């Protein structure tokens, strides 16, 4: 029993190592003040963007165009093939993007675990970071990158972003009992990122703005 307990303690210690190292180079911010911008993926004046897309699902790859459009109460997203065949269409309500509505999903993709994974990946793009008493804010030594950490419904969210522009460079969702989602964003063009790379288990996406 003692051997098993010692082994368990060792495993827990190893599991905590990535957590302690992940934030190396960042120190806790004091009073951020009004100059600190909020983490932003799609700017408030964003209206519409098209992305050339390569989507790999459990070893199978589909390609096409993803259209993201800002509507009255959220965001509309659809993916179509190069010949106009629709793969899926989702509506992500503002304020609760993980409660997205599947407007259409092609039969071959219409599987609950897959739909849930797609909604989670895309929903993370539209989620607004929380700024409250539970939020942790850190900044790197050169003061060029802020790390915001908040928690919601069994998940921890990490936003790495520029303190002045608010442009998010990386988004991470760690679910306490689930799959980790990581999104890298770059090449911002005024109102939205030019490049979006998504990694979630056996699902990956490469979106390049047109």
Predicted regions and their residues:
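Bacterial N-terminal signal peptides that target proteins for export
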Residues: 1-9
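Membrane-embedded segments
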Residues: 81-88, 104
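Acidic/charged, solvent-exposed loop-and-adjacent secondary-structure segments enriched in E/D, K/R, S/T
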Residues: 98-130
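Post-signal peptide N-terminal segment of mature Sec-exported envelope proteins
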Residues: 30-52, 143
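Bacterial signal peptide processing site
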Residues: 22-24
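C-terminal motif of bacterial Sec signal peptides marking the signal peptidase cleavage site
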Residues: 17-20
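Post-signal-peptide N-terminal segment of Sec-exported extracytoplasmic proteins
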Residues: 42-76
């Amino acid at each position: 029993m003692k051997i098993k307990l010692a082994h368990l303690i060792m495993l827990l210690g190893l599991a905590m190592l990535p957590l302690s190292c992940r934030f190396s180079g960042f120190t806790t911010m004091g009073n951020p003040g009004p100059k600190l911008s909020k983490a932003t993926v799609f700017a408030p004046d964003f209206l519409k963007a098209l992305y050339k897309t390569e989507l790999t699902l459990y070893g199978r790859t589909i390609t096409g165009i993803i259209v993201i459009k800002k509507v009255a109460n959220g965001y509309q997203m659809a993916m179509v093939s190069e010949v106009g065949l629709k793969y899926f269409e989702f509506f992500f309500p503002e304020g609760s993007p993980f409660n997205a509505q599947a407007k259409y999903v092609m039969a071959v993709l219409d599987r609950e675990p897959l739909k849930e994974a797609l909604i989670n990946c895309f929903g993370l793009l539209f989620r607004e970071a929380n700024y409250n008493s539970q939020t942790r804010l850190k900044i790197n030594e050169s003061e060029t990158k802020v790390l915001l950490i908040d928690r919601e419904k069994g998940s921890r969210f990490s936003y790495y972003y520029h303190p002045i522009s608010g442009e998010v460079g990386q988004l991470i969702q760690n679910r306490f009992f689930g799959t980790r989602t990581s999104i890298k964003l770059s090449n911002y063009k005024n109102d939205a990122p030019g490049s979006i790379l998504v990694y979630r288990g056996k699902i990956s996406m490469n979106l390049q703005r047109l």
